[in-house]
Swiss-Prot record:
Keywords: Amino-acid biosynthesis, Cytoplasm, Diaminopimelate biosynthesis, Lyase, Lysine biosynthesis, Schiff base. The record marks 46, 109 as: Part of a proton relay during catalysis. GO terms for cellular component: cytosol. This is 4-hydroxy-tetrahydrodipicolinate synthase. It holds the Pfam family DHDPS. GO terms for molecular function: 4-hydroxy-tetrahydrodipicolinate synthase activity. Its EC number is 4.3.3.7. Coiled coil: none annotated. Catalyzes the condensation of (S)-aspartate-beta-semialdehyde [(S)-ASA] and pyruvate to 4-hydroxy-tetrahydrodipicolinate (HTPA). The lineage of its organism: Bacteria, Pseudomonadati, Bacteroidota, Cytophagia, Cytophagales. PANTHER family: 4-HYDROXY-2-OXOGLUTARATE ALDOLASE, MITOCHONDRIAL, DIHYDRODIPICOLINATE SYNTHASE. Pyruvate binds at residues 47, 205. It comes from Cytophaga hutchinsonii (strain ATCC 33406 / DSM 1761 / CIP 103989 / NBRC 15051 / NCIMB 9469 / D465).
Length: 297
């Protein structure tokens, strides 16, 4: 199995004005990211608007990603949900040829107990043909995968790590401290990636790296190599932009920035709506500052 160290971009799904998938823009986005030095790509994650893409679109997006990638970097594919049997069925019907790992979000809305979360992931791992990365994002799911549960998951065959986006550095440290080295903790929060790596995490799955793949990758590499002064200097450039990515929902912000950069349109599917004029203005201002700082370093 490929080791998922460094930066993984949680790829957006570009849409045309009619809200159909813009596969050409998707190809360009992938090439932009890989050629800029990201370590792996994530297809059909939360940032990809997976809640509002069809089964056929998901399969086509994966096919396109694998074709463009052509084996250059590892590929992670997202399949998750709050119906364990249905998630297993979707895993069984998916084509994993060329896929290196599965990213699966914690069950949301029905708020299972910690034992239920554990049994959900155990059942998925037993049926999945590739290694599984659990995903803790309580801000979206309404439930936190506790450190104790993550530690239990580290003992399950075929679960190789957790994408930790609880925002709790103490929880991340507890997981890192009490799991084997081969159980990977990956930051799911762009602004907490550097401090989480300082505790022993191995990288980040990032939203911002869609737009600044070279600089974000440089930051993560510096942190992994314990060059924290350099990593923090780069991180400081993103502190104004990052909250704007979420101000009106993800990927609304990052798609607005990608449109500003000429990479794809900012179209999203309902119930998400495009960014307000006020937010677009703030994103433009923050982008000007970042590009100016790039030019000066």
């Amino acid at each position: 199995m490929h080791t998922f160290y460094g930066t993984g971009t949680a790829l957006i799904t570009p849409f045309k004005k009619d809200h159909s998938v813009d596969y050409d823009a998707f190809k360009n986005l992938i090439e932009f990211n890989i050629s800029s030095g990201v370590d792996y790509i994530v297809v059909n994650g939360t940032t990809a608007e997976s809640a509002t893409t069809s089964k056929e679109e998901k399969a086509k997006l994966l096919e396109v990603a694998l074709d463009v990638n052509n084996g250059r970097v590892p590929v992670m594919y997202g399949i998750g949900g709050n119906d364990t049997a249905e998630v297993i069925q979707r895993i069984g019907s998916a084509d994993f040829k060329g896929v290196d790992a599965l990213l699966s979000v914690c069950p949301y809305y029905n708020k299972p107990s910690q034992e239920g979360v554990f049994q959900h992931y155990k059942a998925i791992a037993e049926k999945c043909p590739v290694p599984v990365l659990a995903y803790n994002v309580p801000g979206r799911t309404g439930i936190n995968i506790s450190a104790k549960t993550s530690i239990r998951l580290s003992e399950v065959k075929n679960i190789f790590g957790i994408k930790e986006a609880s925002g709790d550095l103490v929880q991340a440290l507890e997981i890192i401290k009490n799991t084997p080295n081969e159980f990977l903790v990956i930051s799911g929060d762009d602004l907490l990636a550097v401090p989480t790596i300082s505790l022993g995490a191995v990288g980040a799955i990032s939203v911002l790296s869609n737009t600044y793949p070279a600089k974000f990758s440089e930051m993560i590499k510096a942190a992994i190599q314990s060059r924290f002064q350099q990593a923090t200097q780069i991180l400081a450039r993103f502190t104004e932009m990052n909250p704007l990515m979420y101000e009106e929902g993800n990927p609304v912000g990052v798609k607005s920035l990608l449109e500003l950069m000429g990479i794809c349109s900012s179209e999203v599917r309902l119930p998400l709506v495009k960014a307000s004029g006020e937010l677009i203005h703030k994103i433009e201002q923050a982008h000007v500052k970042i590009t100016r700082e790039y030019a000066n370093h």
